[in-house]
Amino acid sequence: TRLRCDWSSDVCSSDLPVGPLRLIDEIGFDISSHAGASLHKAFGERLNPSLALVALSETDRLGKKGGQGFYQYEKGRREKPDESIYGELQIPVPAEPQKFSDHEIRARLVLQMINEATHALQDGIVQRADQVDLALIMGTGFPPFRGGLLRFADTLHPRSILYHIRKLEEVYGTRFTPAPLLIDLAERDRTFYQAFGT
């Protein structure tokens, strides 16, 4: 697995307080890998663990708490991307980072989150859309001005979300297979808050 972000732009952060690579550094590779294994055990192929993260968790690299993660840290402050990580993954340092548009990066992150939130509703883990929104605002720092993940999803509409997730599924496979509930909402022309509102 290659690291696909152009680190210099840190565009991965989108509207979130930190981007995914920095978040993993904050949490630590060991804990992130353990969480990934637990999610895989609970949800199977839908949430395969990152092979790169598993490999990194088996090294001395711990993330920010160890001073070395995706970024180098001095005195607890993020300094710059740590390109030595490529050696630990046994892949060459790319001459040019793969370029993805800001829109594509945000879409891949947010559509994946919406799809998993849909699974949580479908599986009865949560009963209402506002529960998902509160959990993501309080737990991940999802921007409150968006109203929460599913309130934001409703501004896009499940039909549009389904269309874009299916496009990603064509390119990236089962990681983007749409939740059956998302298909149902799109077919019935219902939003999350219409179907699962308070």
Segments from the language model and where they lie:
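Single conserved hydrophobic/aromatic residue that forms the stacking wall/gate
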Residues: 1-11
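N-terminal glycine-rich phosphate-binding loop for ADP-containing cofactors
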Residues: 9-198
